[in-house]
Regions:
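Charged regulatory segments coupled to nucleotide-binding catalytic modules in large multidomain enzymes
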Residues: 152-156, 179-201, 210-252, 363, ...
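GHKL-type ATPase core
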Residues: 74-75, 100-236, 336, 386-403, ...
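Acidic ATP/Mg2+-coordinating residue in the GHKL
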Residues: 80
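Short, highly conserved beta-strand within the GHKL-type HATPase_c fold
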Residues: 66-77
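Bergerat-fold GHKL ATPase/HATPase_c domain
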Residues: 1-56, 88-92, 223-225, 230-237
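Conserved tyrosine-mediated DNA breakage-rejoining catalytic core shared by Y-recombinases
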Residues: 258, 314-352
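Basic, Lys/Arg- and aromatic-enriched nucleic-acid-binding interface segment
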Residues: 258, 267-309
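A short glycine-centered beta->alpha linker in the GHKL/HATPase_c
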Residues: 84-86
Length: 624
């Protein structure tokens, strides 16, 4: 029997998402049009937020052939007044999957580095049209690109590039894609509407394919401070991340070529071309403290090789084997590999140790992680049963696993730093709810910062009742890092918390007119999918959501009680006005008298009292 050999292939990130675009929210023309809108609008808002610019975002969707039935090609354009993108970055930013500026540990709407590029990829595979990018980053020159994406190579193909004069900074992105606006229209309008609620400092305009304009001007002029990039927290680290951090902490052995030798000569202040090995080392010893690290490494290598500059230029360093104290190099003159023994007692041995074996454990902890000081680092070393001076580059695979496990279990690390987060704020959130819903009652809360798996997060929540709110509540508006989440609500942690609440306990019955607005901001939102539509039910996040909702529900319960008391006062006043005259008449007849008692003054006093009480209750409710 003949055997069939398996064929192994490697595919690029763009080819993977081309075959699995459902993962990023591009499953059908309806969802894809909505997702593309989201990605470009969020990129525009993120760019403005990072530079402290009050955003002006203009969204346009135009049918290529208005007479054709859906699904059909649409031209989607998003224009902003942000900082723009430098010309050299545009091709990679819009023509490469998993390339971008959002991979640092900071709060941002985008986090996977593929959303906008996936929209461009979807447009290309459904209409075969390039993306058009117009960017002005200096306020003077606009660079206009037409770009296609080479799916197999995950590289951009520049179809066209022109420049022209411009008067202001900003970015415009336009793609042609297959969509179904007849089905996606409601979601897109809801998205723009809800984005305006959670970003009251932004002005967003939407021109739809039917010629309608939806304008949402800003009503808050104070923009929240931009989020900042932070170092990771020890509780949010795994083995692979530690391994990468160790590599980053290690200093590469410099290439010893003519340029490096000239740099060493310059830093040592050597004017004489030919100096002996001894003269060079004496000069280096005097200037050691002022020499940069690269030069120190070269001097350390020279000390063991016993070579001057002329001989040093004829070799290449191959390896530094610290455990065996050997230095390997290639001799171009003899065309062979050679090795020498290194003296561990030499003053230069430590320099090479630092270069090859990395930082000591305590230095690694204090320099690479947030909120870890020398005292905590020493305590952790004892907890992990590692020597504080242990070099990170000497850890075995098992020691790395043990280190990762110890980082997760050590309880004396401080809580993650939340100063990097940029929540919307209770006051802007309340203003947004009042503007959009005109409620009879509104209450908001911003919970103290908390953390899950080493990632800080803050919960903001608002609750509103009555006014322009439709019945059938609670209506839940979910946000994460100021992104409206409109799909897949059934599996979201916020919906879980709302559904678990016994609303009858808070005097809310039937299908009342009330809403809940929930906002989670974090350096790492635990989305369930790359489509960023629902948040996983992490225990810490669920707890904070519950506490926020319970606090607001008690406020709502108090409002409902006082509202009930006010209504009862009005009812009592109406009852007095209706029945006291009748009682007076019956009493007069029963007593055989002709003149009725003077009940009007008493009635006026009682009605005035009940009315005053009702007004007082309503005023108290209105002031909440």
């Amino acid at each position: 029997m003949s055997s069939i050999k398996e064929k192994f292939n490697q595919i690029s990130p763009s080819e993977f998402f081309y075959s699995n675009r459902d993962l990023a929210g591009f499953s059908n023309p309806t969802r894809s049009l909505y997702t593309a809108v989201r990605e470009f609008v969020e990129n525009a808002l993120d760019a403005c937020d990072q530079k402290g610019i009050l955003p002006d975002v203009h969204l346009t969707i135009k049918a290529v052939d208005p007479e054709k039935s859906d699904p059909k090609p649409y031209i989607l354009t998003v224009k902003d007044n942000g900082p723009g993108i430098d010309a050299e970055h545009i091709p990679l930013a819009f023509g490469t999957v998993l390339y971008g500026s959002k991979f640092g540990l900071k709060q941002a709407r985008g986090m996977f580095g593929l959303g906008a590029t996936m929209a461009i990829l979807y447009g290309q595979i459904t209409t075969n049209k390039p993306v058009t990018v117009k960017s002005c980053a200096d306020g003077q020159t606009q660079n206009q690109f037409e770009i296609l994406l080479d799916i197999q190579k995950n590289k951009p193909v520049i179809v066209k590039h022109i420049t022209k004069d411009a008067a202001k900074k900003g970015l415009s992105v336009s793609i042609c894609l297959e969509g179904d606006y007849s089905k996606a229209g409601n979601k897109i309008r809801d998205y723009v509407y809800e984005t305006s609620l959670i970003t009251p400092y932004a002005s967003i305009t939407f021109d739809d394919p039917k010629g309608q304009k939806f304008s949402h001007p800003r009503f808050v002029k104070d923009i929240p401070p931009p989020p900042t990039i932070i170092r990771p927290h020890p509780h949010g680290i795994d083995v692979e991340r530690i391994r990468r951090m160790i590599v980053e902490s290690q200093f590469e052995i410099p290439t010893i070529d003519d340029a490096m030798i000239e740099k060493v000569r310059k830093d040592l202040g050597l004017s004489v071309k030919k100096l002996s090995f001894t003269s060079i080392m004496e000069k280096a010893k005097k200037k050691w403290k002022t020499l940069p690290r690269q030069v120190r490494v070269v001097i350390a290598l020279m000390s063991f090789l016993k070579m001057d500059f002329e001989k040093l230029n004829k070799i290449r360093i191959e390896d530094i084997d610290m455990p065996n104290k050997k230095l390997f190099y290639w001799d171009f003159g003899d065309s062979q590999s050679k090795s020498i023994d290194m003296d561990p007692e030499s003053q230069y041995y430590k320099q090479l140790t630092n270069t090859v074996q990395g930082e000591p454990l305590t230095t690694f902890l204090t320099k690479r992680f947030q909120r870890v000081g020398p005292t905590t680092a020493l305590k952790f070393a004892a907890f992990a049963k590692l020597k504080p001076e242990k070099r990170m580059g000497t850890l075995t695979n098992q020691e790395l696993v043990n280190l990762s496990d110890a980082l997760q279990k050590f309880d004396d690390f401080m809580a993650p730093d939340s100063s990097c987060l940029a929540p919307l704020g209770a006051e802007p959130l309340e203003k947004g709810i009042k503007k959009f819903f005109n409620p009879d009652f509104v209450a908001v809360v911003q919970r103290p910062a908390s953390a899950y798996s080493g990632f800080p997060f803050i919960i903001e929540m608002g609750i509103a009742y009555g006014g322009d709110i439709k019945s059938g509540g609670p209506h839940v508006y979910r946000y994460a890092n100021r992104i409206p989440l409109l799909y897949d609500e059934g599996s979201d942690v916020v919906i879980k918390v709302v559904n678990d609440t016994d609303w009858g306990r808070y005097k809310v019955k039937g299908e009342p007119p009330f809403i809940i607005v929930s906002h989670i901001c974090s350096t790492r939102i635990p989305y369930k999918t790359a489509g960023k539509e629902n948040v996983a039910d992490r225990q810490e996040i669920e707890r904070e959501l519950r506490l926020a909702l319970q606090y607001l529900s008690r406020k709502l319960s108090s409002f409902m009680s006082k509202r009930g008391q006010a209504e009862m006062a009005k009812k009592r006043a109406n009852l007095y006005a209706k029945y006291i005259p009748m009682i007076a008449e019956f009493c007069t007849e029963l007593s055989g008298k002709k003149k009725e008692p003077n009940y009007k003054k008493m009635l006026e006093t009682e009605i005035a009292f009940e009315t005053k009480k009702a007004v007082k209750e309503e005023n108290e409710i209105g002031n909440k």
